C-alpha cells in the first residue's frame, strides 16, 4: 500500500483553488438534512468536484465514448475496468429468483450485493492504491450503494453520483491523471470507465428488475440516471448530430426497430436515450419522457447542456432525497465534515418530493 500523499491542489485557471486534506476524514452518512445538503455545495470538496465535472465537460466536446480493449490504458483505468468486468461476472453467482407478486425488485439482488461487499475490498486492495484513497473509495462504492440498494432493490441518480464521486477521488491523489498523469486519463474515466459502469448498472437493472430510486415519474428527466445526459450533451456541442437526430438514432437501436440503425451510438446522451427505451414502453416517447422530448426539439446542444448543468445542482446535488445515502468524507467535503449520527436505511430515499404518476398508469 502506498503511503499518504498530498493531493494536488487545483489550479486557479480551472476554478479549483481549494484545499483538500491529505489525511481526509473518513466518509460518513452526513447529508441527512436540508441545511447540510445546502452547505455541501459550498464546501471545498464539492467545489473541487464540480470544477472537475465542468472541466471534463469542456474537454469532452467532439470526443466519442471509448470501447474495446484497454490493455494500453493507464494502471488506474485498467484496474477500474477490470473491476467492472468482474462485477458483471458475479451475476452468475446470484441468479434471479422466480417472481410472482413483486412488480419491482428481484430478491437475488441482495445476494449479489452481499458478494459485492465480500469481494470488492480485497479486489481494490490488490490495486496497491494510496491508503487515503482506499478509505474514501470503498464507502462510496459499498456503503453508498453505487450499484443499487440491496434493501429497497432500487437504483437511481444518487447511486450514480456516488460512483462518479469515487472516480473523482481517484484523481485527487494523482492515482489517475492529476499531477502524476494526464488530463486524457481523466477524460477516459468518463469516456471509457463511466460508459462501462452504465452498461453494468443497466444490466443489473434489467437482470434484477430494480425499481427507479426516487422517481418523479413522467415529469422527471430519467428514472435511473442524470450524468450521462450532462456529459453526453457536452460531447455533442457543435456536433452535426442534433438533439432530434440523437433521439431518432436511439430509437433506431431499439430491438423492435424494423430497420438497421443508421449509425453506431458514440455519445453518452444517445446511449442513455437508448437505455431508457429498453425500460419504458406502452406509450410514445413524448408521453413517457416529456422533458427529454422537449430537449430533442432544441436546434442545438447549447441550451440543453446549460440547462442540465443547472438541473444537476438543483435537482440532484441539491435534493436531500437524492443524496442522503451518500457517504461523504474529507475529499468530498474538505475539512470539518459534519458529524451526524447514522440514521440507517429506513428513511433513505424517502422525502417530500413525491413522484408523479404517469397519466396512462392505472
Swiss-Prot record:
It is found in: Cytoplasm; Nucleus. Its EC number is 5.2.1.8. This is Serine/threonine-protein phosphatase 2A activator 1. Residues 1-10 have a biased composition (Pro residues). Keywords: Cytoplasm, Isomerase, Nucleus, Rotamase. It catalyses: [protein]-peptidylproline (omega=180) = [protein]-peptidylproline (omega=0). PPIases accelerate the folding of proteins. It catalyzes the cis-trans isomerization of proline imidic peptide bonds in oligopeptides. Acts as a regulatory subunit for PP2A-like phosphatases modulating their activity or substrate specificity, probably by inducing a conformational change in the catalytic subunit, a direct target of the PPIase. Can reactivate inactive phosphatase PP2A-phosphatase methylesterase complexes (PP2Ai) in presence of ATP and Mg(2+) by dissociating the inactive form from the complex. It comes from Cryptococcus neoformans var. neoformans serotype D (strain JEC21 / ATCC MYA-565). GO terms for molecular function: peptidyl-prolyl cis-trans isomerase activity; protein tyrosine phosphatase activator activity. It holds the Pfam family PTPA.
